[in-house]
Each structure stands twice: as C-alpha cells, then as structure tokens.
C-alpha cells in the first residue's frame, strides 16, 4: 500500500470544497493508498515531524497563486520524508529551481519534483597493455683493453665508429622502452564526454533571480549591507528625489515669506502715523494749561489710567516740570 501526504496551505482551511476536490483526485489516482493530511506551517515550525522515507507521493494545495514560494528548510524536510523515486506535485513555485536542485530534487517536464533513486557506482578497471615478449636488458659493449701499439695515422679511426654505433643502440633501446609505457598510459585515459548521456546534455534550466519586491502591495524590505541586486541604488535614488522635492518646497516657502514681509513693510510705510506738534503737546504736562486725555494725571495714581506714563509718581501741579530730583526728599 502506498503512502500519500496531502500538504495544505493555511488559506485552504476555509475552502472545504478545494480540499475535498484534492482528496477525490488523489483517491482516483491512488485507489488503495493511505492518505495523510498536514498543514505546511506546522511542518515549517517543527510542530509536526514527518517520518523519514515514508511517503510515495506528496501533493501540495495552495490557492494563493501570487505567493507559491516554499522555504528551502521545508523542501529539505519533504525530500527526507519521500521514498526513493517519490514525487512532489501540486501548486509548486516556478522560480525556485535552484533551491529545488540544491535540496536534491529533480524538476520534471510537467513541473513536478521527484526524488531520484541512488545510482550504484561502477568502477572502471585499468586496462592492461597487451603482453609482449619479455624485453631484454640493454647490453653494453665493454671496450677491450689492448696494449698500446704504434698505428698509422692515415688509417681510419675504428674506435669512433664503434662509439657511434653503441650510442645509436642505446637511443633505440630507450625509445622502445618509453614507447611501451606511453601506450599503456593512453589506454588509461577516459573521455569525460563519453560518461554523459545524450539526454542530459544541454538540459540546463536557467534560473532567473527574483526581484526584491513583495506581492499584494506589501512594503518592500530595506536593502542588505552588501546588496548586489540594485535595491540599494534604487533606495538612494528615491531618497535623493525626496530631498530635492523638500528643498524645492522649502525654497518656495522662504521666497513667499520674504515677499509677504516686503509687502507688509511697504503697507506700514504707507499707513505711517505722523503726530503734529499740537497733538504732542496735548499730553505734555510741562506746558501750562494742558491736561491729559483723562484730565487726572496730576492728581495721583488713584486717578491715573492703566497706561499712564506717570504711574508711581506723586501728584504734581499742571505745568510743573517733573524730575526725579524733586522727589529726592520723599524717597
């Protein structure tokens, strides 16, 4: 009896029809199988421990098509729970081929993942060279010592010819010896291309790196310290654009404030109040016969207004010059 694991995304719990449809499909495909059901979050948080090499097939149901990614740690747990040759199918991500391969899975043409069965290694034995006749050791001609005799210098030098022939024999012997060894070494060489099957050649899935952005309009994370995906440069451009906008707004505000201050100053200059000598003498108590607006400034603090400039001074007579020296005796 085969073991089947139905792996559910947390959002599937609210859709019972989708779960029942997945169960009926697995029952039709594996009629005599034992079905086990788990939620992927419980496996990711180690709340559920899957048995090792136990399931023949795992089916993953995830209705959230915009977020199908599976953490690499969960991939490793699912790989360990599958039997050799088992498959993982369902709503699987299409942009995590590198993580899938790193965890041991093989991506099939239909998009499912399979756990390959272990392959027994075959040792290639060293090919021995064909045995030939036993090689003889090289012989060397030992010159025979002879008594020194008088020779005719006009005759040919036979000793030089003998040395030359011996040297040629030695060279031919060395070449024969090393040529036999090199033939054996050539037999040991194995072409690497012959070890690769034709079906595996040029079958490479190009993995495109994911963009640094989240679906459903979620807030993007900050760039890493050693960011190489371009997110750091993008953030710097956004910050620079924000600074430029702020500088522009502040410049406009300062310019408008300056213009407004100039307008107010011009308005004040136009509406400046000018007092005549007659107006000024109306409140000058040094002039005889003049009194203040309240006509009681000379009577004392009890009769003076709140803003009277003579608050705190003793009563005086109208027309009298008020000085501090005149009150020195009272202090």
Curated annotation (Swiss-Prot):
Q: Where is this motif: Cx2C motif 1?
A: 294-297
Q: Which Gene3D superfamilies match?
A: Fe-S cluster assembly protein Dre2, N-terminal domain
The record ties this protein, via InterPro entries, to: Anamorsin (IPR007785), CIAPIN1 (IPR046408), Dre2_N (IPR031838)
Fe-S binding site A: where is this region? 212-229
Q: Identify the stretch(es) annotated as Linker.
A: 147-202
Cofactor dependence is on: [2Fe-2S] cluster; [4Fe-4S] cluster
Q: Which domain of life is it from?
A: Eukaryota
Coiled-coil ranges (or none): none
Similarity annotation? Belongs to the anamorsin family.
- State the oligomer form and interacting partners: Monomer. Interacts with TAH18. Interacts with MIA40.
Q: What does this protein do?
A: Component of the cytosolic iron-sulfur (Fe-S) protein assembly (CIA) machinery required for the maturation of extramitochondrial Fe-S proteins. Part of an electron transfer chain functioning in an early step of cytosolic Fe-S biogenesis, facilitating the de novo assembly of a [4Fe-4S] cluster on the scaffold complex CFD1-NBP35. Electrons are transferred to DRE2 from NADPH via the FAD- and FMN-containing protein TAH18.
Domain comment from the record reads as follows: The C-terminal domain binds 2 Fe-S clusters but is otherwise mostly in an intrinsically disordered conformation. The N-terminal domain has structural similarity with S-adenosyl-L-methionine-dependent methyltransferases, but does not bind S-adenosyl-L-methionine. It is required for correct assembly of the 2 Fe-S clusters.
Could you tell me what this protein is called? Fe-S cluster assembly protein DRE2
Origin species: Clavispora lusitaniae (strain ATCC 42720) (Yeast)
């Amino acid at each position: 009896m085969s073991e089947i694991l139905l792996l559910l995304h947390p959002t599937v719990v609210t859709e019972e029809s989708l779960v029942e449809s997945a169960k009926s499909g697995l029952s039709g495909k594996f009629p005599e199988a034992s079905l086990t059901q788990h939620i992927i979050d419980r496996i990711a948080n180690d709340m559920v421990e899957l048995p090792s090499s136990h399931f023949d097939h795992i089916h993953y149901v995830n209705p959230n098509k915009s977020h199908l990614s599976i953490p690499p740690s969960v991939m490793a747990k699912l790989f360990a729970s599958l039997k050799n040759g088992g498959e993982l199918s369902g709503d699987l991500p299409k942009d995590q081929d590198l993580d899938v391969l790193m965890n041991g899975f093989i991506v099939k043409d239909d998009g499912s993942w399979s756990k390959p069965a272990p392959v027994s290694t075959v040792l290639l034995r060293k090919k021995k060279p064909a045995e030939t006749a036993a090689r003889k050791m090289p012989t060397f001609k030992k010159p025979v010592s002879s008594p020194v005799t008088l020779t005719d210098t006009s005759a040919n030098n036979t000793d030089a010819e003998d040395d030359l022939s011996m040297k040629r024999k030695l060279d031919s012997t060395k070449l024969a010896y090393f040529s036999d060894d090199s033939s054996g070494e050539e037999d040991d060489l194995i072409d690497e291309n012959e070890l690769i099957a034709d079906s595996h050649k040029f079958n490479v899935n190009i993995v495109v790196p994911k963009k640094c952005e989240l679906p459903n309009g979620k807030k993007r994370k900050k760039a890493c310290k050693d960011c190489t995906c371009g997110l750091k440069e993008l953030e710097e451009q956004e910050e620079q654009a924000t600074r430029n906008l702020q500088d522009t707004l502040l410049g406009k505000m300062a310019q408008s404030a300056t213009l407004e201050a100039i307008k107010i100053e011009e308005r004040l200059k136009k509406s400046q109040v000018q007092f005549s000598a007659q107006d000024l003498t109306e409140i000058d108590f040094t002039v005889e016969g003049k009194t203040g607006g309240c006509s009681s400034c000379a009577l004392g603090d009890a009769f003076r207004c709140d803003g009277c400039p003579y608050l705190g001074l003793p009563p005086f007579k109208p027309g009298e010059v008020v000085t501090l020296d005149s009150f020195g005796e009272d202090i």
